[in-house]
């Protein structure tokens, strides 16, 4: 009984310190961001978080999946890419990993950052940053996958074809993506908007 009480107090003490450390890290992450950039990035992240729990749809770019669209996708990529019951796709927005990042940035800013992971890396090639300088809204690319950094050591992504919560749109830790390449879409978007 006494050991349990000590464990609870220790956990609360560590949790408070950890929370303070995470909040300090976030303050450092956003320190050099303009208010305008932070506002846009927060809207993008919020839009992605609003989709948390939705299932992964290979080839989905944010469109509502109809029976016809699902048939097109299956004809293009193959039945094995759509392992869930068809009703789990139809009538819902469809997102694969790059579809989520494409759609959120396009919806908030009106700027197309590319559809696929390859296209996004090509479009953003001049905006690569070191992982040590990562900021909210940055995209981390690993082999054929992309995640969005939310800040405070967290990411959001359309993870895999497995049913949610194993797959689908979910949040997680950056620790599994620290070897990826980081790009900053907001810098590209700002350039595009100044040219208009």
Model-derived regions, located:
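Sec-dependent N-terminal signal peptides of Gram-negative exported proteins
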Residues: 1-16
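...with weaker cross-activation on analogous glycine-rich loops/strands in unrelated enzymes
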Residues: 4, 8, 35-45, 102-172, ...
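N-terminal leader/targeting segments
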Residues: 6, 177, 194-196
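N-terminal capping segments
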Residues: 13-98, 106-111, 143, 158, ...
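Generic structural motif recognizing short loop/turn segments at the entrances and edges of beta-strands
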Residues: 52-54, 178-181
């Amino acid at each position: 009984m006494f050991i349990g009480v000590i464990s609870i107090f220790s956990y609360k003490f560590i949790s408070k310190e950890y929370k303070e450390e995470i909040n300090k890290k976030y303050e450092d992450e956003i320190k050099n961001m303009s208010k305008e950039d932070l506002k846009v990035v927060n809207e993008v992240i919020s839009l992605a978080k609003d989709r948390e729990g939705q299932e992964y749809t290979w080839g989905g770019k944010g469109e509502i999946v109809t029976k016809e669209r699902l048939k097109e996708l299956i004809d293009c990529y193959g039945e094995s890419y759509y392992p869930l019951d068809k009703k789990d796709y139809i009538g819902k927005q469809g997102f694969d990993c790059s579809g989520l990042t494409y759609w959120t940035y396009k919806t908030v800013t009106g700027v197309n950052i590319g559809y696929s992971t390859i296209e996004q890396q090509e479009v953003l090639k001049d905006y690569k940053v070191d992982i040590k300088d990562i900021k909210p809204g940055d995209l981390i690319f690993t082999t054929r996958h992309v995640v969005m950094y939310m800040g405070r050591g967290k990411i959001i992504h359309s993870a895999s074809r497995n049913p949610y919560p194993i797959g689908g749109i979910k949040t997680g830790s950056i620790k599994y993506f620290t070897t990826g390449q980081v790009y900053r879409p907001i810098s590209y978007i700002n350039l595009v908007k100044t040219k208009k």
